[in-house]
Structures are given as structure tokens and as C-alpha cells.
């Protein structure tokens, strides 16, 4: 879809991974949410591993280096306390993969709800299928929904409890970034999207479509 950055995509994470994977999207993970915690892009959480470039989002058995999290403003408690909350989430989830390369965003909106712990999942073949479906969706459904609640409505209409996902949207200089983490059938899905001169509603609509595709194709 016109305006979307190439790094828009979807990733499925599991606490048990046998193989190193290249996540489609390059070196950006603008927002990160986990188990109700939400950090804005002011938080830089870099993946550190021997012989690995953290900006490529390559996934492996790693340790994590937490760089200082800067608050977007004095009132932005989501940013100031995110490090401890995310670290606590890692203790429950087992492994987390993230690299952040964008600064200066302000938090536009955030909805936080509990997430279930993810279960093991064979990601490689499923991720490839989802990326192909994503390309089709972006070509065939370019329309913009007028409500910010599209994602919630879509999931509720499909019988998916909205308590199983969390999302946040940030914006700067005409660019918007949306990150959604959702628990589907015991799996953890991460949708990360960036658009230039596109609305928050558009990002949410595309995220909802992408999540539904994932839900329909999970084993």
C-alpha cells in the first residue's frame, strides 16, 4: 500500500526457538509491548549477541542489553517504568527479541491488556505464508476505516477476546508506527507497521487484517 514502509510486517515469537530467523523488516522495532507493558520508541532496547548485528533483527538464543530508557515527557510513565516491566515480562516469556532505532516519537495512544504466555510454534513456514497474505491484503484493501476502534471491533466480531492483545501507536514528522502484540491460541504474534502520511486508523485496520490472517492460519 502506498505510504507503507518496507519494514511493515508480522512476526511470531515462541519461548522455544530452534533456528535463527531473519525477521522481515530490517532494523526497526519502533514500539515494544509485552504482558501489558508499553514502551515508546524513546526506549532503545538492543539485541546483543556475539557476531550479530542488532539492527538486522536476527533471532537467536541471546542475552539482552537494556540501554537507558528516556521518558518522552515527565508525565510519560509508560516510558519511564517500561524497562522493569519488560524485564519482568521476559522472565515469564523466556526470550524476547527487539531492536529499536527511532527516537523522538511521542505516544499518541496506547491500550494495554493482559497477555497469555506464548507456546512453542514452528515459525518458519508460517511466517512465509503470512508475509504473502500480508502483501495481498495491502494490495486489495487500501481503504481507510474511520474509527480507531476497528481493531477491537474486528477481533470481537471474530469472537476473539480483546483482553488477549495490547497495542500502541506513535507518530513523528508525518510518520506513524503501530505495534500490536497478541496472544492467539497460545502463540504470541507481533505486528509492527510504519506508514508515511497514513492515519492511525489505517494502521490499525491493516494490523487487524493481518492478525486475522494469522489467526486463520495458525496450526
Task: State where each predicted segment sits.
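Structured C-terminal helix/loop/strand segments within mature extracytoplasmic catalytic/sensor domains
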Residues: 1-4, 20-21, 27, 131-219
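Mid-domain, small-residue-enriched loop/turn segments at the edges of structured enzyme/sensor domains
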Residues: 7, 68, 74, 78-135
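Active-site SXXK
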Residues: 9-11, 28-56
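Short hydrophobic alpha-helical segments used for membrane anchoring or interfacial signaling
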Residues: 10-18
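Soluble non-cytosolic domains of exported or imported proteins
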Residues: 28-33, 37, 58, 62, ...
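Short glycine/serine- and small hydrophobic-enriched flexible loop segments
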Residues: 41-53, 85, 125-132, 212, ...
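Short, well-structured active-site flanking segments
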Residues: 45-66, 90, 137-141
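Short, mixed-charge aromatic SLiMs
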Residues: 58-75, 145-160
Amino acid at each position: 500500500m502506498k505510504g507503507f514502509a518496507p519494514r511493515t510486517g508480522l512476526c511470531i515469537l515462541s519461548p522455544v526457538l530452534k533456528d535463527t530467523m531473519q525477521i522481515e523488516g530490517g532494523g526497526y522495532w519502533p514500539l515494544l509491548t509485552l504482558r501489558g507493558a508499553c514502551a515508546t520508541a524513546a526506549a532503545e532496547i538492543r539485541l546483543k549477541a556475539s557476531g550479530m548485528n542488532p539492527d538486522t533483527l536476527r533471532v537467536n538464543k541471546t542475552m539482552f542489553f537494556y540501554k537507558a530508557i528516556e521518558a518522552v515527557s515527565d508525565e510519560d510513565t509508560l516510558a519511564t517504568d517500561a524497562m522493569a516491566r519488560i524485564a519482568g515480562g521476559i522472565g515469564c516469556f523466556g526470550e524476547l527479541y527487539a531492536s529499536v532505532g527511532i527516537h523522538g516519537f511521542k505516544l499518541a495512544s496506547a491500550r494495554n491488556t493482559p497477555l497469555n504466555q506464548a507456546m512453542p510454534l514452528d515459525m518458519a513456514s508460517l511466517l512465509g505464508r503470512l508475509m504473502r497474505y500480508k502483501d495481498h491484503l495491502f494490495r486489495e484493501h487500501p481503504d481507510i476505516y474511520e474509527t480507531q476502534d476497528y481493531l477491537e471491533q474486528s477481533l470481537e466480531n471474530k469472537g476473539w477476546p480483546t483482553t488477549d492483545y495490547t497495542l500502541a501507536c506513535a507518530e513523528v514528522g508525518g510518520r506513524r508506527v503501530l505495534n500490536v502484540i497478541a496472544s492467539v491460541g497460545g502463540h504470541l504474534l507481533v505486528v509492527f507497521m510504519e506508514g508515511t502520511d497514513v492515519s492511525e486508523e489505517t494502521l490499525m485496520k491493516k494490523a487487524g487484517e493481518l492478525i486475522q490472517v494469522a489467526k486463520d492460519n495458525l496450526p
